Amino acid sequence: MSEGYLRHLLSEEIADLEMNGCTADNWENIKVASPFHAEHVCNVHFSGSVALGLFEKEFTLPGGVKKHSGIRNATLHNCKIGDNTLIENVHNYISNYFIGDDCFIQNVNVMYVEGRSSFGNNVEVSVLNETGGREVPIYNGLSASLAYLIALYRHRPALILRLQAMIADFAERQTGNYGFIGNHVKIINTGTVSYTHLRAHETSAH
């Protein structure tokens, strides 16, 4: 979704949303892509800054059931929703997430990020022995060979320090206040999704 074509809601669109059971702390903080079709947004509460993409496509489910993209039965707080995404039956809320295009999110309890998070990057994990001393900082790009170097080349302290600094720098660049759900992600029948970055085409289902 490009922010270049987002706009504020028109008064008649707000009226349509309210007829659909939607509420907002402040409608001025809600932006939408054009054309906006309010009929695809029902029983949603908005708070904070929320941006909505287009709702123009349908999803075909196993058995031939079709569901139109849109948002139904959810609370959104400080979120950006991409084009042609379906969010349906969020029992609590989604807070501080950027959600990509063509995502399918259904029957989720809660999704949130609170405060700054590195999303698991640069978290040290003990390896080889349970008493510590050979911790490896994990991060998104960690390979088996790099973990081997960090764990077993402690006799090369300069090398270890450089690798640790590289990982710390990567983690700092990943740190932020918003979680990220990539394009074409499916999250179905899931309890809590917190402090998460999901890449495109991933699936979380229980």
Regions found by a protein language model. Give the residues of each.
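Conserved small/polar residues in nucleotide/adenosyl-binding loops
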Residues: 196-203
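Terminal amphipathic alpha-helical/low-complexity segments used for targeting or macromolecular assembly
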Residues: 1-184
